[in-house]
Amino acid sequence: MWNPNAGPNPYPPQVVCPGGSNPACPPPLNPAFPPGPCPPGIPQGNPAFPPCRPPYPVPQPGCPGYQPSGPYPPPYPPPAPGMCPVNPPAPGMVGPGIVIDKKTRKKMKKAHKKSHKHHKHGKHSSSSSSSSSSDSD
């Protein structure tokens, strides 16, 4: 089982410090990914993804000045500086992660319909338009 010559503590403390927090013990180096710029020669790491430069343009996550490369025309109108181009949400969606119950959605639909200034012709029109009273001059 345990070595009787090991002393009072049968499990000696670990000599290896993996984190590199001890200045006497530097962190272990990974030979597959050496630190620093790529040396001119054989590419290290995964040959499918060389660490020097990607084989395709990677868009930066920063929004200002982001131009997608490709045959797509620029968005019209161009977004204001400092604002990201935003795709309109699908119908029924309000925003990222926002869920609205049916009652509130119905209210919002009604308010949205009211905001349109189109005259609706039909039996169920609750508002009496003033266009029919124009003959009382």
Curated annotation (Swiss-Prot):
Region annotated Disordered, chain positions: 26-54, 94-137
Instruction: Locate the compositionally biased regions of type Basic residues.
Output: 103-124
Ranges annotated as spanning the membrane: none
Q: Where is the composition biased (Low complexity)?
A: 125-137
- So which residues are the signal peptide here? none
Q: Which compartment or compartments is the protein found in?
A: Nucleus
Q: Highest taxon of the source?
A: Eukaryota
Q: Which UniProt keywords apply?
A: Nucleus, Transcription, Transcription regulation
Q: Does the keyword Transcription feature in the UniProt annotation?
A: yes
Q: Which GO terms describe its cellular component?
A: nucleus
Role description: Negatively regulates TSP1 expression at the level of transcription. This down-regulation was shown to reduce taxane-induced apoptosis.
> What protein name is recorded for this chain?
Proline-rich protein 13
